[in-house]
UniProtKB/Swiss-Prot annotation:
The keyword Lipoprotein does not apply. The modification N-acetylalanine is found at A1. In muscle, parvalbumin is thought to be involved in relaxation after contraction. It binds two calcium ions. PANTHER family: PARVALBUMIN, PARVALBUMIN ALPHA. Gene3D superfamilies: EF-hand (1.10.238.10). Ca(2+) binds at D44, D46, S48, F50, E52, E55. This is Parvalbumin beta 3. Belongs to the parvalbumin family. Is regarded as an important allergen. On the 2D-gel the determined pI of this protein is: 3.98, its MW is: 11.33 kDa. It comes from Merluccius polylepis.
Amino acid sequence: AFAGVLADADIKAALAGCAAADSFNYKTFFKSPEEVKKFFAIIDQDHSGFIEEEELKLFLQTFSAGARALSDAETK
């Protein structure tokens, strides 16, 4: 889903940077408003125009099936 948006090395680095529970910080994860728009379209799985909490919790798994789910604290 992220082909053409991020290189494989960037994906691995991003996942490694937030592997620990409660370590995800969207401010450091997305680099530009354009990137946010691209990711929003990918994360909004049901194309509702909103990112539901469940979609957000599973966001890292969009990169890699083995990635952790975000915690409640990280999605608030």
